[in-house]
Amino acid sequence: MIRMTLDEVRELAVRILRRHAFSEAHVQAVADTLVAGERDECASHGIWRLLGCIATLKAGKVSADAEPELHDIAPGLLRVDAHGGFSQCAFRLGLPHLLEKARSQGIAAMAVNRCVHFSALWVEVEALTEAGLVALATTPSHAWVAPAGGRKPIFGTNPIAFGWPRPDGPPFVFDFATSAVARGEIQLHERAGKPIPLGWGVDEQGEPTTDASAALRGAMLTFGGHKGSALAAMVELLAGPLIGDLTSAESLAYDEGSRSSPYGGELLIAIDPRRMLGASAEEHLARAETLFEGIVEQGARLPSQRRFEARERSARDGVTIPEALHRELLALLE
């Protein structure tokens, strides 16, 4: 393993992205999310993703110099056209406008269209909670996941992220795929030659498997059976047809076998609790804290607690990167 400081991780990411002629706006936005993944010990969304970024670029499936375009479509609605660039750059452009609309209207939604997406959603919902807003974000991906009772992929991993601001300490945040696990976790098991648990995926014949490669060729499974399947369908609708963008099946067809990152849209919703509650805001937000205390007092963890603990460790001790991955990343500089 190679130990690196967070600054060193960021410097490496920036060098690689610049080497491949990404615009400076893309360089900074993408590097920040990759560092966030490593910092929070979320390796599936860390610097390993650079391999996919560059592969997607070489396949011609992402625009390195795309300039996102903002469309103000209603008092509580806006749209950012990523023009084929990475989602992070488009999100950054739209964020201040989403904040302004949510504070003005009490609730606002932002669609990010025609973007290439690989980022963890918790990075974005945390940006909204830092501004005191309640946040919800979701996006389809490629059709990798079979519906409950089926054997062929039709859904993406279709994550859902939620954030709730808290007066002291980190926000209440969860970000999970509606599949049993993020696809990146299976890919990391494949890289390490490790078996996956039963319930993560099936092979090409629809049979349960512990072989990571077989699951990647076959289909992933939803979490919770029909419940996860219904939520996956909801994500397809909210961040696909509702915002005029692709479903996961359409994204995979657009990919044309290049194995690039998913292409499509993302939906973000921001709610200002103080506009919703008015003069009684403090009273009701305090009741939320009572709920959280009741969870923790039982010895249970709040979602993302491990990430926040990892964040403190990484700031102090740095992070570790597998040597093989480090060599692959350095090769991208050649």
From Swiss-Prot:
Annotated InterPro entries: Mal/L-sulf/L-lact_DH-like_ah, Mal/L-sulf/L-lact_DH-like_NADP, Mal/L-sulfo/L-lacto_DH-like_sf, Malate/L-lactate_DH-like
Disulfide bonds: none
Molecular function in Gene Ontology: delta1-piperideine-2-carboxylate reductase activity; identical protein binding; NADP+ binding; protein homodimerization activity; pyrroline-2-carboxylate reductase activity
GO biological process: 4-hydroxyproline catabolic process; proline metabolic process
Induction: Expression is induced when the bacterium is grown on trans-4-hydroxy-L-proline (t4LHyp) and cis-4-hydroxy-D-proline (c4DHyp) as sole carbon source.
Known EC number: 1.5.1.21, 1.5.1.-
Active site: S44, H45, E185
Gene3D superfamilies on file: 1.10.1530.10, Hypothetical oxidoreductase yiak, domain 2 (3.30.1370.60)
Record-listed NADP(+) binding positions: 117-121, 175-177, 226-227, 301-307
Reactions catalysed, as given in the entry: L-pipecolate + NADP(+) = Delta(1)-piperideine-2-carboxylate + NADPH + H(+); L-proline + NADP(+) = 1-pyrroline-2-carboxylate + NADPH + H(+); cis-4-hydroxy-L-proline + NADP(+) = Delta(1)-pyrroline-(4S)-hydroxy-2-carboxylate + NADPH + 2 H(+)
UniProt: substrate binding residues: R49, T157, R183, G184
Keywords: NADP, Oxidoreductase
SUPFAM superfamilies documented for this protein: L-sulfolactate dehydrogenase-like
pH dependence: Optimum pH is 7.0 for Pyr2C reduction and 10.0 for L-proline oxidation.
Family according to the record: Belongs to the LDH2/MDH2 oxidoreductase family.
Function of the protein: Catalyzes the reduction of both Delta(1)-pyrroline-2-carboxylate (Pyr2C) and Delta(1)-piperideine-2-carboxylate (Pip2C) to L-proline and L-pipecolate, respectively, using NADPH as the electron donor. Cannot use NADH instead of NADPH. Is likely involved in a degradation pathway that converts trans-3-hydroxy-L-proline (t3LHyp) to L-proline, which would allow P.aeruginosa to grow on t3LHyp as a sole carbon source. Can also catalyze the reverse oxidation reactions, albeit at a much lower rate.
Self-association state and partner proteins as the record states: Homodimer.
Protein name: Delta(1)-pyrroline-2-carboxylate/Delta(1)-piperideine-2-carboxylate reductase
Organism in which the protein naturally occurs: Pseudomonas aeruginosa (strain ATCC 15692 / DSM 22644 / CIP 104116 / JCM 14847 / LMG 12228 / 1C / PRS 101 / PAO1)
